Amino acid sequence: MCDSKDNSGVSEKCGKKFTNYPLNTTPTSLNYNLPEISKKFYNLKNKYSRNGYGLSKTEFPSSIENCPAKEYSIMYDNKDPRFLIRFLLDDGRYIIADRDDGEVFDEAPIYLDNNNHPIISRHYTGEERQKFEQVGSGDYITGEQFFQFYTQNKTRVLSNCRALDSRTILLSTAKIFPIYPPASETQLTAFVNSSFYAAAIPQLPQTSLLENIPEPTSLDDSGVLPKDAVRAVKGSALLPCIIVHDPNLNNSDKMKFNTYYLLEYKEYWHQLWSQIIPAHQTVKIQERTGISEVVQNSMIEDLNMYIGADFGMHFYLRSSGFKEQITRGLNRPLSQTTTQLGERVEEMEYYNSNDLDVRYVKYALAREFTLKRVNGEIVKNWVAVDYRLAGIQSYPNAPITNPLTLTKHTIIRCENSYDGHIFKTPLIFKNGEVIVKTNEELIPKINQ
């Protein structure tokens, strides 16, 4: 136990009682109502330390073995202050990240000589020991506010009780006393925000409506290619930079200049094929949809997530703590399967029963995810084409009296997809209508 005269810099307020007042840590979307501590980098100070103390980093004590890292400390008049942002997790806890080097607080799985766990600087991995619960508290007598950090289901509390010398007090987590810590211990766990830097946060785009399937205007009009298709923004989410791999930026630059990245979800009509089919003729056409393994692996590497076989989003450890916020912002569901969406190749036989040649263009709904920096630069994008929503437009569409007919459907390859169903034939494609195939039904529905 530290008294008011020890090297921790604790003031004469020893002996006062404290009452805890939990902060409002209800999970919120990353798109809206970010708490201030998730929008700014603050230098933390102990509330009862002498003026001039602030958060810093020190070389890890040489007596600690098998843990090559730097440890966080509260240091008097330090020349290299550390500024921290707290990224809000789905469950209301926080990842505490350092503006200078992009690393995070980590409760090291070793013990100091007083049975405390040191708080070290480490690359973000998503492990439990990097998650901290922040609770607001108030001095019972003065009413002055501060906050405390807890780990391991509130069985341990962040403390600055272990002094290396008269200038430096290491941060560590101490075991919670049965009811509440003695007041002299509580002051060692009381922190306040000091000076700050603003985080770099991109603006969220407005959502928009998806246009109808494009119509060809002549026999020579081959339709709209994917690169020229009009996109509709259906959702967007702010991604903490700690979960993003940006091949052109290191962790420090990401944290300073792209504290959050923007992930946009857009939809557009992706052209599968365009062909003139002679009157009363049948043609065989291959259709390629889904997403390739190369693209999926790229998404996993850069975002730590992938598109499931049901077109929902699946998250790995680094991103899973933010998955509810991300899917809510993107307006996309969580995947109900661990199977990755793969590439689907099908062979279709179409019959033109009209008395004239007709230009047909088939489109399927594309789901596009685009990662952007704060300045709007595109880092990368990933596209999955959804074969379950498709439609055909034709020219001329009058005086055509007979629609295009799908007479045969064969799956050539269906990688990693749990939906290997084929359409029941014959299937009529009415001009401009979207065929909607669900996972539950073999018989397609027609959008009216």
UniProtKB/Swiss-Prot annotation:
Processed by proteases extracted from mosquito larval gut. It is found in: Spore, Perispore. GO terms for molecular function: toxin activity. Transmembrane segments: none annotated. Residues 1-198 are annotated as: Beta-trefoil domain. Disulfide bonds join 67-161. Residues 199-448 are annotated as: Probable pore-forming domain. Keywords: Disulfide bond, Sporulation, Toxin, Virulence. Signal peptide: none annotated. GO terms for biological process: sporulation resulting in formation of a cellular spore. Has an N-terminal beta-trefoil domain and a C-terminal pore-forming domain. The trefoil domain has barrel and cap subdomains; the cap has 3 possible carbohydrate-binding modules while the barrel is involved in host cell receptor binding. At neutral pH the carbohydrate-binding modules are accessible on the toxin surface but the barrel subdomain is not. Component of a binary toxin active against Culex and some Aedes mosquito larvae; mortality towards both C.quinquefasciatus and A.atropalpus is maximal by 48 hours. A.aegypti is not very susceptible to this toxin. This subunit is responsible for localized binding to specific regions of the host larval gut. Binary toxin internalization into host gut cells requires both proteins. Forms a heterodimer with BinA. Belongs to the toxin_10 family. This is Binary larvicide subunit BinB. It comes from Lysinibacillus sphaericus.
